[in-house]
């Protein structure tokens, strides 16, 4: 499949300062029933008739500029977009891809301001969406769609896979397209920990025997780790699926806080403080201050070793009780100026070629959203055997212990309750 086929397929309330809030607070505001009182802006001339063919989409995309709002904090991800994605888009369709640094609450805030003001053409044509942001944007009616069924390369995606079709327990329904799929992994110093703990009991025992050598961050990655543990205390796999259940959460979290309080004195700095984010945790690990770090991307360990962020002896694994697996997505704002061009970009990004390139640890190490069972044999073999993935088990093995993202309310509660039950009690 050449570059052309990658694009075409084989057949041709007012929160204008929202960015000041954390994602958890933003979700809480929406869950409390507070949404923008403004109406969705009138659709612009850039909107496509539902019956438009893919060839018509391609023609409308010619020569346009697509502004993609995405996190720009990783030089290797930026290089993938700049050096590998942008050139063929420009050559094939004259599409100029411009990256705008924006993520999370900042993106939601900018889109909300647009909606409140009735601005028909916004700053973004495409946005990188993670979990809770999709929940917020759907509540705001800020996303264009459904559009994924119009993408030729979407035929390689298994839309029955709940890790694709559901985003934080909410159906995507064609309003965002999966771009990458990852699973949280714990990373250990294989020289100090040649046989890492595989169960919660074994982990607790290891922490007691090696005081000060384990911790987790106080940010998104650490809270995702706690979500994975919460499943075990709630009854195991599938126990937290479905809408938020207050009683179930309280029962499971009480066991989680008891487990954490029991190991807390044996954590790094006696559990009185925690790294603010996973970057700080990686630094502690690299400085040999702790023997474990972690990542929400199972493929990141190889990528970060190549970057020199993590040492050569870093190895990744998953507890037998499982870990959170999720997808990150691309969405088109309802007021995007160039929706057709954005669709062409998304179709390219989910092509087998682009997904394989992105999965390479030397490029990004981001897992594919394509189902190998739906791919031609050539691509099936390539995506099942990623060059350079040597420090983490195969994705097919990790999938057996994958846990779905629970309802977004759980992330809010864990953020709040962890501070009250663990951090403040230690002071």
Per-region residue spans from a language model:
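N-terminal secretory signal peptides that target proteins for export/translocation
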Residues: 1-15
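Extracellular/periplasmic catalytic domains that process cell-envelope and extracellular macromolecules
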Residues: 60, 119-122, 136, 168-171, ...
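Mature extracytoplasmic/periplasmic domains
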Residues: 323-324, 328-398
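Conserved C-terminal helix/tail region of periplasmic/extracytoplasmic solute-binding proteins
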Residues: 50-52, 283, 390-427
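Extracytoplasmic ligand-binding site segments that recognize negatively charged/polar headgroups
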Residues: 71-84, 98-108, 124-280
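Early extracytoplasmic/lumenal segment of secretory-pathway proteins
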Residues: 37, 46-132
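C-terminal motif of bacterial Sec signal peptides marking the signal peptidase cleavage site
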Residues: 32-33
């Amino acid at each position: 499949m050449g570059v052309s086929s990658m694009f075409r397929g084989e057949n041709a309330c007012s929160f204008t300062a929202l960015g000041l809030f954390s994602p958890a607070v933003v979700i809480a505001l929406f869950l409390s029933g507070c949404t923008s009182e403004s109406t969705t802006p009138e659709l612009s001339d850039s909107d496509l008739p539902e019956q438009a063919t893919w060839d018509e989409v391609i023609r409308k995309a010619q020569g346009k500029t697509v502004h993609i709002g995405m996190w720009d904090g990783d030089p290797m991800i930026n290089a993938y977009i700049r050096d590998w994605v942008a050139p063929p888009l420009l050559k094939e369709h004259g599409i100029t891809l411009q990256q705008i640094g924006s993520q999370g609450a900042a993106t939601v805030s900018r889109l909300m301001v647009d909606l409140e003001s009735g601005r028909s053409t916004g700053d973004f044509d495409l946005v990188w969406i993670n979990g809770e942001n999709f929940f917020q944007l759907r509540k705001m009616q800020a996303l264009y769609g459904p559009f994924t069924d119009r993408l030729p390369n979407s035929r390689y995606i298994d839309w029955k896979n709940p890790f694709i079709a559901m985003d934080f327990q909410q159906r995507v329904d064609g309003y965002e397209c999966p771009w990458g799929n990852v699973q949280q992994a714990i990373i250990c110093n294989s020289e100090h920990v040649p046989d890492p703990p595989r169960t919660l009991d074994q982990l607790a025992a290891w922490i007691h025997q090696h005081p000060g050598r384990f911790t987790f961050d106080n940010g998104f990655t650490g809270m995702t780790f706690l979500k994975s543990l919460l499943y075990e205390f709630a009854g195991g796999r599938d126990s937290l699926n479905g809408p938020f259940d207050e009683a179930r959460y309280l029962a499971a979290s009480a066991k989680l806080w008891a487990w954490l309080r029991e190991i807390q004195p044996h954590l790094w700095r006696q559990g009185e403080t925690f790294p603010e984010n996973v970057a700080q945790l990686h630094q502690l690990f690299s400085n040999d201050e702790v023997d474990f770090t972690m990542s929400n991307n199972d493929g990141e360990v190889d990528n970060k070793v190549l970057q020199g962020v993590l040492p050569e002896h870093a190895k990744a694994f998953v507890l037998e009780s499982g870990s959170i697996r999720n997808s990150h997505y691309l969405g088109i704002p309802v007021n995007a100026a160039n929706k057709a061009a954005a669709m062409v970009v998304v179709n390219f990004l989910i092509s087998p070629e682009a997904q394989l390139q992105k999965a390479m640890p030397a490029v990004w190490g981001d897992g594919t959203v394509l189902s190998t069972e739906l791919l031609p044999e050539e691509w099936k073999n390539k995506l099942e055997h990623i060059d350079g993935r040597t420090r983490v088990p195969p994705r097919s093995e990790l999938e057996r212990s994958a846990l779905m993202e629970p309802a977004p309310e759980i992330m809010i509660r864990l953020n709040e309750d962890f501070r009250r039950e663990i951090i403040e009690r230690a002071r």
